[in-house]
Regions:
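Soluble ligand-binding/transfer domains with enclosed cavities or grooves
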Residues: 5-9, 20-278
Length: 278
């Protein structure tokens, strides 16, 4: 049973120190901007004040380059918070000649990891941003960069899906097996509910290219145990999803999936929590 959206949002309260890092489309780290995010509850947590400060090269010892605040008493339809505090937000509709974007966020004790995926008006992936955050005054640490080897094996978990039209949320068991089949290729078999999907990827360093489906996809393996799974090109009248993963520890991986139908309408968000079983 999932808690309500606001209660799950409150699991993000606190002061989070971190950075916004621009990632190239090939997974290279570019500019990084130090940040402090405060989420503070008032009026018995019926009001939440959001404050984001971004800093220059001098870091926290210098005045912020930007300081943005906003107050929330309710959340918009486009954002879903799950029981762990993880969230999925983004565009409600893929429209012609318009930018499209999604943000995913995970919470694990004194850590948060957020990720932004942006597409230009022509539907091409244009910008990806990795946001690594640590609760202030804790010894929270960054995870190692994600590798193919860390993904290999069998994983079992539960997928929690919330629908945009507010039909009842669903849970289903998941099983995923990832094998190295040689020649710089891997095979992935994913089962959820009564469906099984099999795909193969070409390994190019820290990039996995999935090219055998209706939409070519690329998974970037990134610092802090993160991964970004995106279509290379968004097309009208073709359903799609964007996904972000986080290897919370060696034996637990979480994924956030935001799905759109062939009309370009956002239809659901899914949070998957998987544990290594082999």
């Amino acid at each position: 049973m999932m808690g309500n959206n606001w209660e799950n949002f409150l699991k993000n309260l606190g002061e989070w120190q971190g950075s916004f890092t621009q990632i190239s489309l090939q997974g290279e780290l570019l500019d990084s901007i130090p940040s402090i995010l405060n989420l503070e509850g008032f009026e018995n947590n019926e009001l939440v004040r959001f404050r984001l400060r971004r800093f220059g090269e001098g870091g926290y010892s210098q005045p912020p380059l930007s300081d943005y605040s906003q107050e929330y008493r309710f959340l918009g339809k486009q954002v879903i918070f799950f029981d762990t505090g993880a969230f999925s937000k983004g565009s409600l509709q893929l429209a012609p000649f318009s930018e499209f974007g999604a943000e995913s966020g995970f919470v694990a004790e004194n850590r948060r990891l957020r990720f932004v995926q942006l597409y230009d008006p022509q539907g091409s992936l244009s910008s990806i941003i990795l946001i690594r955050e640590f609760r202030a005054n804790t010894d929270a640490r960054e995870r190692p960069p994600l590798t193919v080897k860390q993904l290999l094996g069998q994983w079992e978990g539960i997928a929690y899906t919330v629908y945009a039209d507010w039909q009842p949320s669903e849970t289903c068991a998941t099983h995923i097996e990832v094998k190295d089949i040689g020649d710089d290729r891997l095979k992935q078999e994913l089962s959820f509910g009564d469906r099984t999907l099999t795909s193969t990827a070409r390994i190019e360093g820290d990039i996995l290219h999935f090219e055998d489906g209706p939409i070519s996809r690329k998974i970037l393996l990134l610092p802090d145990g993160a991964s970004s799974n995106t279509p290379l090109q968004l097309k009208l009248r073709q359903s799609f999803f964007v996904e972000v993963g986080w290897l919370v520890d060696d034996n637990e991986r979480q994924r956030l999936i935001r799905s759109y139908n062939e009309k370009g309408e956002w239809i659901s968000s899914t949070h998957v929590i998987e544990h290594r079983v082999g």
